[in-house]
């Protein structure tokens, strides 16, 4: 979503906060996920963070999960706790995979996308549990 797309969906405080990010891509990701949440829940929704750093909204019974990476964002909204993680298909996990995948997980498939899928699944579980990943 470009700046025109987020206009009207983000607050002046959020624009100021985004202005502090060094990378333009990170700035866009930050503003985009907030605009998506407000587009779905209403322009007046307040977005904050809980003690674990997870996003929360001021709507009873509404949970939000967010991930952003390399210019893309994913947002999940649910009536139960939720979490999401995304990574680009082009990211090479081959060297890191043995640190977060068990030998039996590594043996499951020769699919080169499996390490990315496992990474995202485990990262989403850490987010869901409100634990640092």
Model-derived features: positions:
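Core catalytic alpha/beta fold that binds nucleotide/phospho-ligands
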Residues: 1-133
